[in-house]
């Protein structure tokens, strides 16, 4: 960044903003880079400003019981704020004085007032000087206020960020990330924009008082008629504003509904294409868009009338002020023209400035109070440590994640009494003692220096909470903790900060080469680092998106190990690693490298327990066992069930085995009933309305929710570049059925009840604490794949006795949750994170305007219509002027024109009624014409928006995956949310305003030029100068805006990154470093924003200077050339003053239009995306086996219905090569093999070897070369849709969209209910669907959050059965399944797909053993393609993976279908026992 010229600028340069010229010149000539931006003045640096405000806020906290943030702000900024306010007032006063001089000039032309004629020229000079003074006062004042607003925002940003790093985990649990981002973006922007308006809360009343005094002098009491009209108008506009908000609120629900489905479509675009659902999704979204646009039109019409009311009001104000006076006393012309000028200023003060100022104060004070509440939240307390301590001791420790359980108990009791009095006593007192269940109960252990403690337990047992308590994140309510305080921590979910691999591992600790190399080697990172060209200096993006899940996990572990500490806390560090890597790291790192350190390792692996010095097994928060492994075997023979999280199967009823949903439903209805009577947001159990549910305001992390019958866990895997597709799914802990998610960790990512209300359900806000406990992958947007939707898993841990009261207590506690923002528009918040670096031109091209205008033929006619009406208006005014000129001087009538082509035709007292008629007649005509002009324009522009949305949606759905892989999901969604909102809401009204203002100016210039042709000569250069200046400024301003927008993203990204790694940050004590990074991001944004404000002010000032020169020219031309006739001078000068203010407004409007048209450019960019080549690329030829008839029938469109192809499911793959993008590396090379009809083939390979890529290649979702044939038909000879319909797909990332069960199973509506129920029976879905009200018509929302992951898999199975597919592709179908659902799926696969070809990519060995052949993929190629016997006899990956099991024992399973079927319960029991021995590849 360059040094700012501002530092050396002179006073004159600062006053006229001339110091910005170099950047304006550079921006005009070339594209600006970040290096071209000037450094910020030291007074604006985040360090200085935050220190200043922090000091004052600390003073406020120390000195008062009730500290006020506004007092701290006042002490920092008040005097400068008032100084600029006074300057602003003086600038505004000049506006009120100008009409007095104008009146005197007009009076000097009165034949009876010859004496004043000589001083007219001096009055003209005085009037021009007033304009110059106004310009020199207003612009510095407005800039100064914007500058103070920016400084206040920076100081508060910093204060909020610092506070966030200090918040206790309990508070973080109650705040969602959306609320925090909203606090920073929505609330604080109010200071930037609003501070310049704030002073009008006192300036406007003073201005009105002054003007009314001056008008009283002119018109006496009748002046108040005009004021009364303006007050009524202001109230009318407020009413219209309220009506508009009503429509917009209704519309918000519809927009949310559309965006949810659009978002689901974008995130699952691969599945949409695999299922051939493009047309169905398009139709569904367009139907929602239709309803939304009806409300958009209503809101636009109301806004249009609101805007028009201002334009048309000018005439009536003058008319109502003048008429009573004229009727009673008659009137002289100069009073009329003076009145007109006064009324223009008055109108602005009453209808615009004062209401805006009041709104600004209301918003700003609200924002300050919210921030004040946030700054007073409870902070994290570090424990008191003794550095000489060598052991770790915990004595009788109990802890709660929640506080204030006594109050909750009372509240629940009252609520329960109320329920009993209503006759509903079925719910409570069953487990009342569990209200406020501690997360840890009476835990005691002691480990000496150098010992390894293994902590194990089922999901939600309290393992992570134990580590949190040692770190001080969770405060014990009883008991003692003792350790030295020198801690290192490795989180369960790996956290990567933006920076190099080396910076992530060293993490601010002093660099030691030997230690660093040892850690890299022990954590198995050497090979990974060597693959990168930059080695360990490769810069990792947000969340480390270039890395696989396993690599991220190992870097997080290396960071923890590199720090020299006394105690190492390792929370399931091996979750993402395959068996072999995990074994090596445990041996070399945990056991050898850290041998003399104290370690606490959360694990569920038997091998780790055997090696540990001490074992602590937790169960439901209590210490189930503490001791050595040998003691464990002797004392607790049943430990495996506690460790794994489920007991033996005979505890379950038959009903429970058939459908896990029964318990889920029971949980939902409990929660619904428990909350409905008192919860503000009336959450109800499965009560469907026509709309989807209300917006949720719950925290995501519900600590206590995790201790329930089923732990529902959120996972958001990221699929990466084809190289690491499988790797981002965390492998489960070996002896636990689900990832060991802690309470206070990955709990319901979205609402677990269905809300009913006016708006569609958005994604639930994520509490900050939950953000930390989820995989860092979630926020990272892969370059090549989209982030996956949340998937859920059910643990089989019965834990039945912990459900009702825990959920109830959690719901109660949510009343005390922090509500930072009542209404957070989270889709809008996305713009904080996804700012595409655009390749669109710096200024909107004429081509974009031309395409926009011609996309809907009616728009051209509407624009011509506007022009015709405008010409009629000008013609009318010229006719009136001509009539007036023809009238004899003694009866001279004169006309004038208000800000809207309205006329004030005033005749001397000969006929007051004649005045009245002309006024009303002319005004009515113009009012009608103005309305006719605007409404069709607004209506047509909304239709254009509708067409653009349709075209863009079609383009995205038809685009090839290679194109979509290069785009961020957030970027695509921004086009449908942010840009469509601009096209719907802002653009039509801004274009209307611009056209209206432009026509007013042209009309006024035309009238003036007719009256005084010389003025036309002055007008031409002014308009030319304005066009050149606008073009010159626009190039730079749009680039600065874009850079500012890009600079906003790092601020919010850094906030989210810090929150995800907050526990790690605090464990390593790196808060100051991260505060510095945050300040750097703030300063970068400030540099862009400050420069944008300065250049904008430069432009506004230059425009005003041109107008001042124009006005001086007009004044002197009219004074020197008019001769007799006060009317003409009056009209010319009044209109010239109008032209000044209106043309400036028009210029700003034109810049707004250009800025908004960039959204249109972005939309066109999406519309122009390439489409998939769906037509056959070669003619059909008979294959070698002579299946001529089959091939020929393919050309027939009814081929699918006749079930002729594919008939057997035979597949032949020849030389298949697959790439993700056109110029990318080959992910798979020269793959060749064939599959017999009905055969089952298993895909084997390490994480990231390309198994999922191969399945995508079969579906032609990638760039592929080579050939695949199904039953002799080549993929080149039929359409893409026909080819994909040959496959049934169960993807890794299950896709359930918001809609009914029926829609989800059959979006095209091809099958009747009978057929759907039949298939539901086959796959075991009937019992699931029947338990929902409405059955097939039950509406699923939020990705089907009421279903377990297993049931979603069953829906995918049912889709495949309905599609009559002969080839089934399964990608990790058991990845997140509990044993029961897994057995249902296995059974379904055996029965429903008995005669189908099945290709299976799977991690579970047991599932793979049912395959007849195996395809082993290594290094992008096929290594082996053989039967299981051959693979076991050779040294292969498969053989290594199951070396610990007895191969012979595994063999009977392969042919299990030939065995006589055993009783169902016995079979399930045996199969599930084998799950315990489960091994993963």
UniProtKB/Swiss-Prot annotation:
Residues 1387-1481 are annotated as: Interaction with GORASP2. It is found in: Apical cell membrane; Early endosome membrane; Cell membrane; Recycling endosome membrane. ATP 1 binds at residues 401, 433, 457-464, 492. Signal peptide: none annotated. There is a cross-link at residue 687 (Glycyl lysine isopeptide (Lys-Gly) (interchain with G-Cter in ubiquitin)). Residues 1449-1481 are annotated as: Disordered. Residues 99-122, 217-222, 320-339, 880-918, 1012-1013, 1117-1130 are extracellular. SMART domains: AAA. It is a multi-pass membrane protein. A lipid is attached at residues 523, 1396 (S-palmitoyl cysteine). GO terms for cellular component: apical plasma membrane; chloride channel complex; cytosol; early endosome; early endosome membrane; endoplasmic reticulum membrane; membrane; nucleus. GO terms for biological process: bicarbonate transport; cellular response to cAMP; cellular response to forskolin; chloride transmembrane transport; intracellular pH elevation; membrane hyperpolarization; multicellular organismal-level water homeostasis; response to endoplasmic reticulum stress. Pfam families: ABC_membrane, ABC_tran, CFTR_R. N-glycosylated. Phosphorylated; cAMP treatment promotes phosphorylation and activates the channel. Dephosphorylation decreases the ATPase activity (in vitro). Phosphorylation at PKA sites activates the channel. Phosphorylation at PKC sites enhances the response to phosphorylation by PKA. Phosphorylated by AMPK; this inhibits channel activity. GO terms for molecular function: ABC-type transporter activity; ATP binding; ATP hydrolysis activity; ATPase-coupled transmembrane transporter activity; bicarbonate transmembrane transporter activity; chloride channel activity; chloride channel inhibitor activity; chloride transmembrane transporter activity. Residues 1451-1463 have a biased composition (Basic residues). Its EC number is 5.6.1.6. ATP 2 binds at residues 1220, 1245-1252. Residues 1470-1481 have a biased composition (Acidic residues). Belongs to the ABC transporter superfamily. ABCC family. CFTR transporter (TC 3.A.1.202) subfamily. Monomer; does not require oligomerization for channel activity. May form oligomers in the membrane. Interacts with SLC26A3, SLC26A6 and NHERF1. Interacts with SHANK2. Interacts with MYO6. Interacts (via C-terminus) with GOPC (via PDZ domain); this promotes CFTR internalization and thereby decreases channel activity. Interacts with SLC4A7 through NHERF1. Found in a complex with MYO5B and RAB11A. Interacts with ANO1. Interacts with SLC26A8. Interacts with AHCYL1; the interaction increases CFTR activity. Interacts with CSE1L. Epithelial ion channel that plays an important role in the regulation of epithelial ion and water transport and fluid homeostasis. Mediates the transport of chloride ions across the cell membrane. Possesses an intrinsic ATPase activity and utilizes ATP to gate its channel; the passive flow of anions through the channel is gated by cycles of ATP binding and hydrolysis by the ATP-binding domains. The ion channel is also permeable to HCO(3)(-); selectivity depends on the extracellular chloride concentration. Binds and hydrolyzes ATP via the two cytoplasmic ABC transporter nucleotide-binding domains. The two ATP-binding domains interact with each other, forming a head-to-tail dimer. Normal ATPase activity requires interaction between the two domains. The first ABC transporter nucleotide-binding domain has no ATPase activity by itself. This is Cystic fibrosis transmembrane conductance regulator. It comes from Equus caballus (Horse).
């Amino acid at each position: 960044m360059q040094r700012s010229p501002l530092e050396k600028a002179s006073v004159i340069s600062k006053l006229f903003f001339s110091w910005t010229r170099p950047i304006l010149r550079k921006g005009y000539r070339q594209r600006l880079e970040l290096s071209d931006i000037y450094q910020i003045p030291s007074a604006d640096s985040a360090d200085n400003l935050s220190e200043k405000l922090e000091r004052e806020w600390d003073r406020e906290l120390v000195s008062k019981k009730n500290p006020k943030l506004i007092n701290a702000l006042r002490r920092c900024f008040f005097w400068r704020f008032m100084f600029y306010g006074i300057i602003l007032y003086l600038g505004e006063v000049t506006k009120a004085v100008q009409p007095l001089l104008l009146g005197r000039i007009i009076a000097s032309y009165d034949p009876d007032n010859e004496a004043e004629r000589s001083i007219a020229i001096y009055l003209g000079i005085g009037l021009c000087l007033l304009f110059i003074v106004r310009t020199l006062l207003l612009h510095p004042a407005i800039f100064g206020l914007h500058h103070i607003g920016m400084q206040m925002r920076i100081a508060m940003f910093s204060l909020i960020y610092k506070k966030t790093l200090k918040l206790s985990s309990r508070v973080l649990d109650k705040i969602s990330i959306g609320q925090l981002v909203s606090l920073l973006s929505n609330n604080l922007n109010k200071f930037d924009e609003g501070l310049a308006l704030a002073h009008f809360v006192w300036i406007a009343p003073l201005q009105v008082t002054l003007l009314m005094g001056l008008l009283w002098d002119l018109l006496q009491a009748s002046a108040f008629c005009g004021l009364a009209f303006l007050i009524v108008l202001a109230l009318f506009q407020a009413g219209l504003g309220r009506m508009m908000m009503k429509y917009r609120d209704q519309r918000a629900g519809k927009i949310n509904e559309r965006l949810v489905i659009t978002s689901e479509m974008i995130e699952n675009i691969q599945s949409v294409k695999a299922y051939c659902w493009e047309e169905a999704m398009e139709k569904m979204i367009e139907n929602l868009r239709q309803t939304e646009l009806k409300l958009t039109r209503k809101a636009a019409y109301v806004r249009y009338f609101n805007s028009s009311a201002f334009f048309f009001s000018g005439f009536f104000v003058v008319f109502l002020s003048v008429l009573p006076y004229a009727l009673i006393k008659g009137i002289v012309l100069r009073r009329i023209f003076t009145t007109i000028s006064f009324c223009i200023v008055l109108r602005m003060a009453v209808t615009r400035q004062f209401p805006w100022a009041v709104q600004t104060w209301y918003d700003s004070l609200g924002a300050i109070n919210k921030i004040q509440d946030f700054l007073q939240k409870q902070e994290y307390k570090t424990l008191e440590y003794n550095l000489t301590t060598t052991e770790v001791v915990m004595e009788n420790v109990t802890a709660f994640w929640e506080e204030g359980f006594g109050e909750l108990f009372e509240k629940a009791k009252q609520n329960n009494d109320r329920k009993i009095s209503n006759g509903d006593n079925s719910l409570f007192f069953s487990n009342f003692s569990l209200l406020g269940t501690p997360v840890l109960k009476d835990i005691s252990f002691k480990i000496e220096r150098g010992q390894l403690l293994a902590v194990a337990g089922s999901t939600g047992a309290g393992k992570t909470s134990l580590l949190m308590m040692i770190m001080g994140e969770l405060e014990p309510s009883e008991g003692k903790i003792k350790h030295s305080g020198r801690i290192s921590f490795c989180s369960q979910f790996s956290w990567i900060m933006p920076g190099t691999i080396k910076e992530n591992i060293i993490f601010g600790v002093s660099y030691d080469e030997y230690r660093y190399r040892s850690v890299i080697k022990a954590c198995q990172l050497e090979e990974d680092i060597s693959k990168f060209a930059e080695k360990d200096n490769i810069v990792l993006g947000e969340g480390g998106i270039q890395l696989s899940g396993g690599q991220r996990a190992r870097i997080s572990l290396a960071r923890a190990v590199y720090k020299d500490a006394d105690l190492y806390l390792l929370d399931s560090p091996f979750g993402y690693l395959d068996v072999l890597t995990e074994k090596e790291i445990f041996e070399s790192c945990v056991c050898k490298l850290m041998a003399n350190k104290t370690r606490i390792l959360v694990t569920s692996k038997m091998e780790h327990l055997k090696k540990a010095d001490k074992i602590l097994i937790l169960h439901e928060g209590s210490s189930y066992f503490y001791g050595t492994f040998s003691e464990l075997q002797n004392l607790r023979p049943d430990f495996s069930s506690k460790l794994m999280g489920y007991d033996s199967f005979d505890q379950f009823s038959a009903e429970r085995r058939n459908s896990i949903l029964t318990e889920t439903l029971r949980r939902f209805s409990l929660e619904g009933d428990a909350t409905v009577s008192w919860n503000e947001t009336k959450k109800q159990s499965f009560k469907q309305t026509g709309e989807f549910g209300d917006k949720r305001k719950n925290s995501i992390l519900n600590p206590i929710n995790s201790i329930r019958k089923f732990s529902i866990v959120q996972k958001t895997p990221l699929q990466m570049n084809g190289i690491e597709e499988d790797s981002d799914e965390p492998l489960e802990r070996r002896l636990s059925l689900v990832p060991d998610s802690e309470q206070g960790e990955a709990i319901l990512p979205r609402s677990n009840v269905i809300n009913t209300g006016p708006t569609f359900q958005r994604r639930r806000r994520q509490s900050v604490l939950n953000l930390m406990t989820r995989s860092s992958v979630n926020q990272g947007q892969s370059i090549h794949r989209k982030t996956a939707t949340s998937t859920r898993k059910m643990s089989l841990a019965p834990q039945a006795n912990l459900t009702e009261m825990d959920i109830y207590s959690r719901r109660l506690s949510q009343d005390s949750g922090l509500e930072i923002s009542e209404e957070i528009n989270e889709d809008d918040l996305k713009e904080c994170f996804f700012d595409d670096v655009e390749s669109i031109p710096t200024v909107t091209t004429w081509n974009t305007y031309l395409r926009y205008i011609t996309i809907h033929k009616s728009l051209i006619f509407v624009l011509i219509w506007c022009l015709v009406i405008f010409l009629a208006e000008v013609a009318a005014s010229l006719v009136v002027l001509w009539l007036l000129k023809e009238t004899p001087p003694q009866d001279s009538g004169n006309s004038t024109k208000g800000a809207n082509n309205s006329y004030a035709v005033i005749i001397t007292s000969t006929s007051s009624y004649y005045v009245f008629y002309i006024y009303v007649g002319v005004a009515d005509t113009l009012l009608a014409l103005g309305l006719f002009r605007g409404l069709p324009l607004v209506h047509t522009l909304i239709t254009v928006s509708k067409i653009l949305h349709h075209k863009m949606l079609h383009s995205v759905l038809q685009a090839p995956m290679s194109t979509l892989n290069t785009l961020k999901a957030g970027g695509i969604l921004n086009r449908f949310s942010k840009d469509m909102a601009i096209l719907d809401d802002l653009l039509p009204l801004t274009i209307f305003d611009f056209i209206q203002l432009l026509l007013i100016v042209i009309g006024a210039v035309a009238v003036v030029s007719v009256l005084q042709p010389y003025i036309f000569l002055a007008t031409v250069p002014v308009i030319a100068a304005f066009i050149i200046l606008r073009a010159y400024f626009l190039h730079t301003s749009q680039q600065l805006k874009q850079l500012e927008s890009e600079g906003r993203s790092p601020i919010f990204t850094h906030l989210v990154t810090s929150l995800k790694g907050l526990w790690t940050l605090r464990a390593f004590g790196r808060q100051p470093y991260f505060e510095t990074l945050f300040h750097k991001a703030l300063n970068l944004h400030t540099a862009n924003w400050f420069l944008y404000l300065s250049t904008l002010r430069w432009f506004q000032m230059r425009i005003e200077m041109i107008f001042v020169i124009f006005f001086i020219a007009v004044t002197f031309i009219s004074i020197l050339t008019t001769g007799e006739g006060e009317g003409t001078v009056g009209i010319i000068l009044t209109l010239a003053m109008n032209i000044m203010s209106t043309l400036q407004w028009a210029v700003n409007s034109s810049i707004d239009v250009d800025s908004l048209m960039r959204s249109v450019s972005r939309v066109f960019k999406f519309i122009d995306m390439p489409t998939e080549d769906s037509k056959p690329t070669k003619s059909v030829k008979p294959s070698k086996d002579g299946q001529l008839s089959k091939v020929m029938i393919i050309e027939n469109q009814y081929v699918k219905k006749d079930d002729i192809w594919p008939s057997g499911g035979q597949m032949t793959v020849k030389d298949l090569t697959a790439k993700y993008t056109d110029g990318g590396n080959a992910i798979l090379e020269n793959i060749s093999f064939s599959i017999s009809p009905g055969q089952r083939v298993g895909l084997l390979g390490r994480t990231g070897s390309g198994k999922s890529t191969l399945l995508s290649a079969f579906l032609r979702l990638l760039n592929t070369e080579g050939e695949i044939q199904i039953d002799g038909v080549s993929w080149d000879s039929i359409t893409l849709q026909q080819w994909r319909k040959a496959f049934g797909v169960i993807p890794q990332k299950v896709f359930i969209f918001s809609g009914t069960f029926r829609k989800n199973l059959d979006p095209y509506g091809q099958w009747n209910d009978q057929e759907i129920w039949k298939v539901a029976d086959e796959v075991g879905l009937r019992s699931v669907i029947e338990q929902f009200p409405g059955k097939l018509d039950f509406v699923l929302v939020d990705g089907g959050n009421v279903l377990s992951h297993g049931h979603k898999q069953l829906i995918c199975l049912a889709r495949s059965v309905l599609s009559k597919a002969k080839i089934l592709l399964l990608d990790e179908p058991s990845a997140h399944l509990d044993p029961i659902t897994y057995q249902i799926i296995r059974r379904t696969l055996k029965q429903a797909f008995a005669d189908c070809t099945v290709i299976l990519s799977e991690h579970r060995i047991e599932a793979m053993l049912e395959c007849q052949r195996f395809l082993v993929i290594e290094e992008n190629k096929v290594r082996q393609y053989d039967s299981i016997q051959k693979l076991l006899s050779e040294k292969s990956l498969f053989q290594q993976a199951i070396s610990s099991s007895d191969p012979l024992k595994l063999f009977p399973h392969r042919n299990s279908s030939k065995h006589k079927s055993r009783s169902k319960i016995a079979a399930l029991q045996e199969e599930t026992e084998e799950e315990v021995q489960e091994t993963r590849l």
